[in-house]
Amino acid sequence: SLQAQYGVTSKVISEMISPTLHPESMEKVYMPMTNTLLDTGDITMASIVRVKVADDVSNSDVEEAMESIATAEGIRSVGMLPLSEMVELQTGEKQRFLKIYQYCAPRTAMTMVDHSDAFSAYLPCRIALIEDKTGQRWLYTLDMNAMIYGGAPLPDYLLEKALRVQEVITAIQMGGAEGDF
């Protein structure tokens, strides 16, 4: 890890870089992201959370579980993008499975955008169900810690809403991976 290699702590780095960042920014965002980036060389891996789908859970079970949890948690399913199916139809060639599920809590989304227009790039929340090149299935989503802790502290009202969305998306992702609802 970067901390072990260079003998630095996240507190020292945080104070050197910017005292205006969230006090947990180094611990929750920048050190884990940097370590993953250095380990993999892949910035996209450093910015996501992935969960392995249980082998005994079908794709339709994943989808049903995620939809059920989203409904129970009061977040809207706002679309699905069956990418692998679309490419198969266009090319006639079999593709490994990739489908993107989109979720949104509209009032929370507008509150976030009212704080910063840049939050719109995070909308809607997405979870991708993908079969990797070895046949293993995963659920991927953006790591919301960057949005929550990566800059200056969010106002309390917004932090509460952002943490709730993170909690719900995590529940959807974990429940989908296990086929639980």
Short names for language-model regions:
Residues 2, 14-16, 36, 64-116, ...:
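Ser/Thr-rich, low-complexity intrinsically disordered terminal regions
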Residues 1-9:
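Membrane-interface motif at the C-terminal end of an N-terminal transmembrane signal
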Residues 2, 145-181:
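C-terminal partner/receptor-binding element of secreted or periplasmic proteins
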Residues 21-73:
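Terminal, regulation- and interaction-focused segments at domain boundaries
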Residues 61-79, 163-178:
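N-terminal hydrophobic signal/anchor transmembrane helix of membrane proteins
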Residues 126-155:
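Beta-strand/loop substructures that line and gate deep hydrophobic ligand-binding cavities in soluble
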Residues 12-24:
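Short extracytoplasmic/periplasmic juxtamembrane "stem" segments immediately C-terminal to an N-terminal membrane anchor
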Residues 55-63, 94, 158, 162:
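Solvent-exposed, acidic/flexible segments
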